[in-house]
Swiss-Prot record:
Substrate binds at W85, N201, W364. Its EC number is 3.2.1.78. One of its GO terms (cellular component) is extracellular region. It comes from Arabidopsis thaliana (Mouse-ear cress). GO terms for biological process: polysaccharide catabolic process. This is Putative mannan endo-1,4-beta-mannosidase 4. It is found in: Secreted. Coiled coil: none annotated. Keywords: Glycoprotein, Glycosidase, Hydrolase, Secreted, Signal. The keyword Iron-sulfur does not apply. GO terms for molecular function: mannan endo-1,4-beta-mannosidase activity. It holds the Pfam family Cellulase. Belongs to the glycosyl hydrolase 5 (cellulase A) family. PANTHER family: MANNAN ENDO-1,4-BETA-MANNOSIDASE 3-RELATED, PTHR31451.
Amino acid sequence: MKCLCFIVLLAIVIAQSYVGVEAAPSDGFVSRNGVQFILNGKPFYANGFNAYWLAYEATDPTTRFKITNVFQNATSLGLTIARTWGFRDGAIYRALQTAPGSYDEQTFQGLDFVIAEAKRIGIKLIILLVNNWDDYGGKKQYVDWARSKGEVVSSNDDFYRNPVIKDFYKNHVKTVLNRVNTFTKVAYKDEPAIMAWQLMNEPRCGVDKSGKTLMDWINEMAPFVKSVDPNHLLSTGHEGFYGDSSPERKNSLNPVSANTVGADFIANHNIDAIDFASMHCGSDLWFQRLDQNSRLAFIKRWLEGHIEDAQNILKKPVILAEFGLGSDTPRYTLANRDGVFTTTYDIIYASAQKGGSAAGALFWEVISEGMSNFAGPSSIILSDKSSTVNIISEHARKMGLLGETTRK
């Protein structure tokens, strides 16, 4: 009982400490001007990481220190962005949305804490609103909810077409964006610590390989999100696969399997309500058996192609929102992982140095100390003195200096 009382008291003290908290140096909404991001009137570069688990761990007040540790370690290395989930759907442990329109307040307060702590420490957040994959609910859960209400649905991709499911998604958007943070007392849609929303993690629609179904969904949902929240940037959460609008790129750059997923990098980002382009580089997932030289050559072609198209066709910034090299990749070595990071960062820096469209890169993924249950093949602990962390820190330093030089 004494322990419980202490935890409750501690939570109250922490909550009170956020009210009227001074703005961190990074405070202010991130906007864009052409192919560059702008923060407080000056160019801003997105150096960062993925940590999907932040709200999950923050749901328990006794493990919130992990979020604090990660954010503090990140800022000490010069990192500026964390990309994380704003969803956890269905009958799962610590679900955020337990049923359409029904939310677990304790889990929502976990997300509140993540945002408040990011604001206090000086990290900007990119928050995703749903998952393409079944993990943590995803579009499959939305389809299951609709089926349980008598809707006739035959595929998980009915997520994009069924009007009831689309209303479920819109209601989730409204609930999250209008949420008033219990720590800061600021609505999410008014919170500068949030850099951007992404419509979905890795949107795909395999039942319509033409890309029309996914395109129609983005055309509907992107303006809807903007109607609820005009303050924040918005992107798709796209992997970067080319579609029929770019047949040459589709044939020369896409992994063969990507030609059937109904996504279109150019068309899906070439609408006014989408502020910046998103791409991933899953070379270890798409081409597991490549030798290192071939892998690095693909990364170079993939990144440079998207950067060029963001610059010349979309005329918007592009963020590499996921990249890395998993330890389960055949012939994996730490040196090979370092090579992937170095090659990736060099290409991003070369564009940014010229004022180009490459606005930053977010590696997959960060975990905190003592999180072996969350550790995956690509997990990195920032407090480790690994060679990869040194590469991350050096790139952040260079991009930070570039930002300072640009601001003069």
